[in-house]
């Protein structure tokens, strides 16, 4: 788990333009992905903006996401969307590729990759097995320190 101080140093090192470029690069991949595209709304404009505001805030930027939308509560906000382990893995692959494409510098890229790798697991809300029932993951597998940071 990354120390909070390292997480909060990402925004000053990446800046608004870096986060905007990251989200744009990520969403270009989502738009072209046959597994992920159907999970997202037809109009990606609002999702892009929310992701930009959330990432900027989480990594030490202005708290505009919380001011506009309240507590992120990401697992709850993603519950309506069918997210399997496979979809999560593809999502992470696209986010990592976007980090590389944009050229997020170290150590910020590593901090971001660790966050995406760990926290994306909490978004899984469906089994990859077609015959398995939908399950609701608990926050138990998410480190309490990360939950506290996200809820701030």
Predicted region positions:
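Core of compact, soluble alpha-helical bundle domains
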Residues: 1-152
């Amino acid at each position: 788990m990354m120390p909070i101080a390292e997480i909060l140093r990402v925004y000053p090192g990446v800046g608004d333009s870096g986060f905007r470029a990251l989200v744009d690069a990520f969403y270009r991949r989502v738009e072209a992905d046959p597994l992920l595209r159907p999970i997202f709304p037809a109009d990606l404009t609002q999702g892009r903006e929310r992701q930009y505001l959330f990432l900027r805030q989480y990594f030490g930027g202005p708290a505009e996401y919380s001011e506009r939308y309240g507590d992120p509560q990401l697992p709850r906000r993603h519950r309506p969307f069918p997210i399997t382990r496979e979809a999560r893995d593809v999502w992470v692959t696209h986010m990592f590729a976007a980090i590389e494409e944009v050229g997020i510098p170290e150590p910020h890229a590593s901090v971001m990759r660790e966050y995406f790798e760990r926290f994306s697991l909490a978004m899984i809300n469906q089994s990859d097995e077609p015959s398995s029932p939908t399950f609701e993951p608990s926050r138990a597998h998410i480190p309490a320190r990360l939950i506290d940071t996200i809820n701030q």
